[in-house]
Swiss-Prot record:
Pfam families: RNA_pol_Rpb6 (PF01192). It catalyses: RNA(n) + a ribonucleoside 5'-triphosphate = RNA(n+1) + diphosphate. Belongs to the RNA polymerase subunit omega family. The gene is rpoZ. It is an enzyme of class 2 (transferase). This is DNA-directed RNA polymerase subunit omega. InterPro entries: DNA-dir_RNA_pol_omega, Pol_omega/Rpo6/RPB6, RPB6/omega-like_sf. The keyword Mitochondrion does not apply. The lineage of its organism: Bacteria, Bacillati, Bacillota, Bacilli, Bacillales. GO terms for cellular component: DNA-directed RNA polymerase complex. PANTHER family: DNA-DIRECTED RNA POLYMERASE SUBUNIT OMEGA. The keyword Transmembrane helix does not apply. One of its GO terms (molecular function) is DNA-directed RNA polymerase activity.
Length: 70
């Protein structure tokens, strides 16, 4: 079984699209800037996307919704 499971991840974010967007953006941050260390102490994954997914399931990474201009 894969960790973290898609069911656990979808409890944290509202859609698969949001999940992919947030995890890809975070993975790119970690890859391009070595100062951005993982928020997870001992990640099970060695790939950036896997680490980002672990951060989401541990509530260390969430999606920000921009405020609409009125």
């Amino acid at each position: 079984m894969l960790y973290p499971s898609i069911d656990n991840l979808l409890e944290k974010l509202d859609s698969k699209y949001s999940l992919v967007t947030v995890s890809a953006r975070r993975a790119r941050e970690m890859k391009e800037d070595s100062a951005r260390v993982p928020l997870v102490e001992k990640p099970k994954s060695y790939k950036f996307v896997g680490i980002a997914l672990e951060e989401i399931v541990n509530d260390q990474l969430t999606k920000r919704v921009p405020k609409e201009e009125q």
